[in-house]
């Protein structure tokens, strides 16, 4: 019996415990009441249907109360794993034309659950009768040798179509895809397939962009090919690169219904890249359109071997098997497709159709003997048009290809055969709706003994991956929207001076405004994989440079601008390119500190200064920034120098000299007296002036219990020096003083002088 063969084919147990036991028993009891004379059968297995009178013949899918009860019983039996008994009930319902394909959803789901994932379920080996024609078989003979010569590193494959990268476009998130794969994305799916970042730049200059212009929106720039990566792929892998171009040309011809011309393109592409699963999968669809079903099956089987977890390859194999009359094998493949993607309505629909047809053993054998697959999909037996079962994700992700070519159409092809061809489009990209468990990692194929990658190292030159700015190996490579790649630090330094690409002069104001530079993932992996020693040396140079920049005693960056004091806030407006670089380096090294000195017409900058610590930076779209910093320590300049356009210095830090005994008591009295005098002066100011001081410098610090506790002295002293109406040259000596007593006396004299002038 066909049901027994199905069970053996899938290695399904006769009975499996299930939570649906009570439902099954209730269905069986109901059937027992309706059927009457079969109480024992109803309790143990499927109940037979009463004899049908000829005059009671019903149209397909007509439901009666007893058929509904038996359908419930069959679904419950299938849920329990009692597939044999469930199939018997389904068969009887089908013979009475009281069963439609849509009612087999529960059976298909249960069968698909029995299909193990991964290596446990390799698709069934092909029949001897499914061998392709001599031409295609000859191609397979030399495929292994050619594949070994053109084996491509997995990193060079597009993560949307899973084929070799063609016209690679690197997005702002750092991931790279084929240009055509990105252009075919609809508005709702315009996101990176890997990280999910929304990509407004995917709207190219088409009708969608014109619609944006009509709506008053600025259309995004067109997608640009990654210049370095495209040239490198063409140099290292001319075969796969050319094959990818031929694939896209064949896709275009197929959409234009030039099926024979598309086949020629794919034949040439397969010779250049015989290990590309996408080529075989797409060519299988072309053969199917041309009604060369044996060749279609042959190519689909190769695609399944190259990518065992690929949904489309198994789906096309199943369609070819069904057309050739091999319903059992087709059902197995359709169930495998359902296990890969349970949400795919097309696979479920076809599996339900094959399940419905399978019990009619004699008709199936006759159809297989005739080689006519059209009877397998008799629309009189199956309710509904399969065209409505297109998966939503596929409709949005793939551009529709009409599989009916005028040249390929034949009067012998049945109506249902045309429907089946319309269901299956050449995949320009894989569906994104694949389940995670199936799409994360593919199990090893027959080519598992081959190395994971094969690169023609003789033609590989490290100079192909050199930055055009520093002339060194890319370190943290970043690709601009115009398609050029630079080291991250090199690009940032260029944007400090001009918001344009250093090579093509395209505007990069958007990059400057967002300041979100994502490293190019594929280029980083490429360098790490094939140039490990060069990368090690490059990283060593970078780390040495960062270590030198993080030294706060030698070559300390100096901002020549104004006076700064310990504990006093110092907001800065940064707009000069050299200081943009300096501030960025201070943040990158983690020190977040730099020196502030007054300018000197003779020496360049003053001998004494103050270290500032960056608390926050607010960037503007044009590259300018406002830095919120605060004074930390005083220093003395030992040696001046320059680095990349800004001043640096070797410095030594200075502190106040502590006193003890009577000198300490005298210092305490002086400290209290000057603090009181300073507080009276501040409170005597006009309210408007006082508010301006408070908004800029904050409130006056409290008096310290021990004025010598801080190596730089009391915080209120520095606050008072910052707000006193003194010229910078008059304030500088206070910064250089190492005696707190001298500093307090100086502040007292200044306050006395100001008070006399006010009076």
UniProtKB/Swiss-Prot annotation:
Any idea where the Lon N-terminal domain is?
546-755
Pfam name, any one: LON_substr_bdg
What GO cellular-component annotations does this UniProt entry give? cytoplasm
Bias (Basic and acidic residues) ranges: 380-393
Q: Which PANTHER family match?
A: LON PEPTIDASE N-TERMINAL DOMAIN AND RING FINGER PROTEIN 3 (PTHR23327:SF41), RING FINGER PROTEIN 127 (PTHR23327)
Chain positions of TPR repeats: 67-100, 243-276, 278-310, 312-344
From the record, give the transmembrane residue ranges: none
Molecular function in Gene Ontology: zinc ion binding
The protein, known as: LON peptidase N-terminal domain and RING finger protein 3
């Amino acid at each position: 019996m066909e049901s027994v063969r199905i069970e053996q084919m899938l290695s399904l147990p006769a009975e499996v415990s299930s939570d649906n036991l009570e439902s099954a028993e209730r269905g069986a009891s109901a059937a027992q009441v309706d059927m009457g004379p079969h109480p024992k059968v109803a309790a143990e297995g499927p109940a037979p249907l009463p004899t049908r009178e000829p005059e009671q013949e019903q149209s397909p899918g007509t439901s009666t109360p007893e058929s509904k009860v038996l359908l419930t019983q069959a679904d419950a039996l299938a849920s329990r794993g009692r597939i044999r008994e469930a199939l018997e009930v389904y068969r009887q319902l089908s013979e009475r034309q009281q069963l439609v394909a849509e009612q087999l959803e529960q059976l298909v789901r249960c069968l698909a659950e029995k299909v193990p994932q991964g290596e446990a379920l390799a698709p069934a080996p092909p029949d001897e009768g499914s061998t392709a024609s001599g031409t295609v078989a000859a191609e397979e003979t030399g495929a292994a040798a050619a594949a070994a010569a053109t084996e491509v590193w997995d990193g060079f494959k597009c993560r949307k179509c899973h084929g070799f990268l063609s016209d690679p476009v690197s997005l702002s998130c750092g991931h790279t895809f084929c240009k055509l794969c990105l252009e075919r994305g609809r508005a709702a799916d315009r996101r990176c397939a890997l990280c999910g970042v929304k990509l407004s730049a995917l709207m190219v200059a088409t009708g969608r962009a014109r619609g944006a212009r009509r709506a008053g929106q600025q259309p995004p720039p067109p997608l640009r090919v990654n210049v370095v990566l495209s040239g490198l792929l063409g140099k290292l892998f001319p075969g796969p690169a050319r094959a990818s171009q031929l694939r896209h040309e064949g896709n275009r011809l197929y959409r234009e219904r030039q099926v024979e011309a598309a086949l020629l393109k794919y034949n040439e592409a397969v010779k250049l890249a015989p290990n590309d699963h996408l080529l075989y999968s797409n060519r299988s669809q072309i053969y199917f359109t041309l009604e060369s079903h044996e060749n279609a099956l042959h190519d689909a089987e190769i695609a399944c071997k190259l990518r065992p977890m690929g949904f489309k390859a198994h789906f096309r194999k199943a369609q070819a098997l069904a057309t050739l009359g091999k319903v059992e094998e087709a059902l197995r493949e359709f169930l495998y497709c359902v296990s890969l993607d349970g949400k795919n309505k097309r696979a479920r629909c076809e599996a339900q159709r094959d399940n419905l047809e399978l019990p009619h053993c004699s008709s199936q054998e006759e159809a297989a003997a005739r080689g006519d697959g059209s009877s397998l999909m008799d629309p009189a037996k199956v309710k509904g048009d399969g065209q409505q079962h297109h998966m939503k994700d596929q409709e949005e992700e793939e551009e529709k290809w009409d599989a009916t070519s005028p040249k390929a159409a034949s009067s012998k092809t049945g109506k249902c055969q045309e429907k089946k061809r319309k269901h299956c489009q050449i995949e320009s990209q894989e569906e994104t709706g694949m389940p995670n468990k199936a799409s994360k990692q593919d199990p090893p194929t027959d080519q598992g003994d081959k190395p994971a990658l094969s690169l023609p190292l003789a033609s590989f030159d490290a100079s192909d991956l050199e930055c055009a700015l520093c002339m060194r190996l890319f370190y943290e490579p970043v690709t601009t929207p115009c398609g050029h790649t630079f080291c991250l630090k090199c690009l940032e330094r260029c944007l400090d001076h001009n918001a344009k690409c250093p090579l093509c002069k395209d505007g990069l104001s958007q990059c400057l405004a967002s300041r979100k530079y994502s490293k190019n993932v594929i280029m980083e992996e490429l360098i790490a994989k094939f140039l490990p020693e060069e990368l090690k040396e490059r990283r060593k140079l970078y780390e040495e440079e960062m270590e030198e920049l993080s030294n706060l005693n030698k070559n300390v960056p100096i901002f020549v601008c104004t006076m700064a004091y310990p504990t006093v806030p110092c907001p800065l407006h940064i707009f000069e390119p050299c200081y943009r670089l300096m501030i960025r380096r201070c943040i990158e090294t983690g020190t977040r500190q730099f020196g502030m000195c007054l300018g000197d017409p003779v020496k360049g900058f003053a001998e004494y200064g103050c270290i500032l610590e960056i608390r926050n930076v607010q960037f503007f779209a044009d590259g300018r920034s406002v830095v919120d910093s605060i004074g930390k320590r005083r220093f003395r300049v030992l040696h001046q120098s320059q680095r990349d356009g800004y001043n640096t210095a070797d410095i030594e830090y200075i502190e106040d000299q502590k006193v003890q005994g009577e000198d300490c008591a005298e210092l305490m009295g002086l400290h209290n007296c000057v603090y009181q005098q300073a507080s009276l002066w501040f409170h005597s100011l006009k309210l408007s002036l006082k508010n301006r001081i408070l908004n800029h410098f904050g409130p006056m610090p409290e008096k310290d219990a021990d004025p010598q506790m801080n190596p730089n002295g009391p915080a209120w002293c520095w606050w008072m020096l910052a707000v006193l109406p003194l010229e910078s040259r008059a304030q500088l000596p206070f910064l250089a003083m190492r005696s707190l007593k001298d500093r307090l006396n100086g502040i007292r004299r200044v306050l006395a002088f100001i008070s006399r002038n006010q009076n």
